[in-house]
Amino acid sequence: MTQTPPQAQAQTEPQPRPQPLSWKLVIDSTDPHAQAGFWAQALGYLIEDNSPLVERLLAAGAVPEAITTHAHGRRAWLDLAAARHPDDPYDEVSGTGQGRRLLFQRVPEPKTVKNRLHIDVHSAPGQRDAEADRLVGLGARVLRTVDEQGGSWIVMADPEDNEFCLN
């Protein structure tokens, strides 16, 4: 009788399923607060409110005022802004979303090439064109309409030219 080497045996035994991981999509931006505002309106999300944490750290002298700003009517981080799903949990101390979340971080350069990753926005049935008009009113642009055998969608760009699709 032959024995299976331990390495081969380990490969054939079912592996335990890993614990699901949380994640956020981080998007480079020249104006993170404007982008968070656009995407919050586009998706029906909330702009994260980090002002209690920012104010507390400023009062304690833990951070310089130069890394903060006023945006959306409150104190915020200068180089970061996020939009989060209104039904998802968030940390009450920092205001940071713990669920579906888009985080915009300031970078010095504008977008120069096609996205390698993009967002698909799903409109209500029969409402795609009306939704495209609404998004254009918020600052998006229509780049093209795609009609293929597998489906139809509108390719759009947000105010900083990040492509996304509207189904």
Residue ranges and their predicted role:
Residues 2-8, 14-20, 24-27, 37, ...:
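Vicinal oxygen chelate
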Residues 32, 128:
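Aromatic/hydrophobic pocket-lining residues that form the small-molecule binding cavity
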